[in-house]
């Protein structure tokens, strides 16, 4: 279970598309998170996005995990995927990590070379909710 799937195989693509539509019918979903999108066919992801939009209407949110520290690669990926797709801001995470390990770090640079600064509408950042006391 949960083994790697060959998304380049037409039958696998059809099954995953059918499954995503079934899931959307069964659960009150309006968004999908795709893991490790750089390992998927972009055409297949666009087909899933289009299929869900066409069958269930607009308003879906699609986000992908593209773990790379290259802002340029991420921006090019977003350009190819279109405006309906967002990515987690991996460069921002790297910046926070780097700043946390640097004595006297300048927090004003945390947004440099990040999706949040470059294409904020397509950037997703994780928020950790405050703990209740």
Residue ranges and their predicted role:
Residues 19-30, 36-128:
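Active-site-proximal helices and loops of the catalytic beta/alpha 8
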Residues 130-132:
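Secreted, luminal/periplasmic, and some membrane-associated catalytic domains
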Residues 4, 8, 32, 36-37:
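Conserved aromatic-histidine-acidic binding/catalytic patches
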Residues 1-26:
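Chitinase-like catalytic core of GlcNAc-active glycosidases
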């Amino acid at each position: 279970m949960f083994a790697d799937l060959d998304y380049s195989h037409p039958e696998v693509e059809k099954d995953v598309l059918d499954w995503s539509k079934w899931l959307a019918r069964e659960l009150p979903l309006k968004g999908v998170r795709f893991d490790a999108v750089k390992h998927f066919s972009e055409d297949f992801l666009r087909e899933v996005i289009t299929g869900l939009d066409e069958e269930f209407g607009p308003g879906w949110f699609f986000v992908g995990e593209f773990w790379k520290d290259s802002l340029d690669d991420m921006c090019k990926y977003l350009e190819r995927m279109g405006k309906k797709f967002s990515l987690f801001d991996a460069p921002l995470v790297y910046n926070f990590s780097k700043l946390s390990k640097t004595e006297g770090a300048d927090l004003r640079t945390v947004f440099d070379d990040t999706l949040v600064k470059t294409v904020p509408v397509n950037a997703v950042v994780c928020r950790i909710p405050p703990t209740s006391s």
